[in-house]
Amino acid sequence: MEEEKKKSRVLIIGATGRLGNYLTRFSIESGHPTFALIRNTTLSDKLKSLSDAGVTLLKGSLEDEGSLAEAVSKVDVVISAIPSKHVLDQKLLVRVIKQAGSIKRFIPAEYGANPDKTQVSDLDHDFYSKKSEIRHMIESEGIPYTYICCGLFMRVLLPSLVQPGLQSPPTDKVTVFGDGNVKAVFVNDVDVAAFTIKTIDDPRTLNKTLYLSPPGNICSMNDLVELWEGKIEKKLEKTFATENQLLKKIKETPYPDNMEMVFIYSVFIKGDHTYFDIESCGGVNGTELYPDVKYMTVSEFLDTLL
């Protein structure tokens, strides 16, 4: 009976990043023996804080097979939270996990739109195809997995009310992309971490994609504008930008400066977060599985911008 209750041992890769730090803390708070792979053993304030919380720090990197193998041998679950630009650096990790043969679950660095469902492959400079490549490698190697798809972090697009180039929401005029009715999903990164840690020992999420689509966080541009107008008690002057106008702007703007607009095109024109049904494509809904997890709503996030 005691063995059944034993919590999985967890290795976090990318523990000093924003999401990785949240993941590490929730893992420890949930009672999982937690390890963090770190490049430098010199204790920064962040690392000291993790160590003081009970995290075991292991020196190593995604390029060093020996250190990876040693770290993987100590745990049951591996969670990667490395930045998207380094996503292909997980290839050696996948091979090491395969060779170890003892990992019960691998959660790769995704935490966005489902890369196999997005419709912007000609625009995104392989942003999503690299994530798909890691997925297909995991599955072809027969590694147990859970993928976390959370739409967009709230700190992406929302602080400007989806106005490219702005750092804060508009107070007079707003540009609405498309007809303004296509819905996107936004989740705060600390909440993404909380849901992710919940999946670790849950058989319902094994070899599944966990979608986070919290009620109150699925919003169209028209919804966002209406919410914001209510908070500032003022109507904004709306201008509508067509799909072709947005595409033209994306193509005229050099990479990576155009990626903000690529995300806007993906979610508010193509509907890449919401055009498919979660259950019918084999996914599971995080807010239904874990109704106890409290999360920030879009309205609450907009309150922080006032």
From Swiss-Prot:
It is an enzyme of class 1 (oxidoreductase). Disulfide bonds: none annotated. GO terms for molecular function: pinoresinol reductase activity. Its EC number is 1.23.1.-. Keywords: NADP, Oxidoreductase. The keyword NADP applies. One of its GO terms (biological process) is response to hydroperoxide. Gene3D superfamilies: NAD(P)-binding Rossmann-like Domain, UDP-galactose 4-epimerase, domain 1. The keyword NADP applies. SUPFAM superfamilies: NAD(P)-binding Rossmann-fold domains. NADP(+) binds at G14, A15, T16, G17, R18, L19, G20, R39, K46, R135. The active site is at K131 (proton acceptor). It comes from the Eukaryota. PANTHER family: PINORESINOL REDUCTASE-RELATED (PTHR43349), PINORESINOL-LARICIRESINOL REDUCTASE 3-RELATED (PTHR43349:SF34). Probable reductase that might be involved in the reduction of lariciresinol into secoisolariciresinol. In most plant species, a single enzyme is able to reduce both pinoresinol and lariciresinol efficiently while in Arabidopsis, PRR1 and PRR2 show a strict substrate selectivity for pinoresinol. Belongs to the NmrA-type oxidoreductase family. Isoflavone reductase subfamily. Dimer. This is Probable pinoresinol-lariciresinol reductase 3.
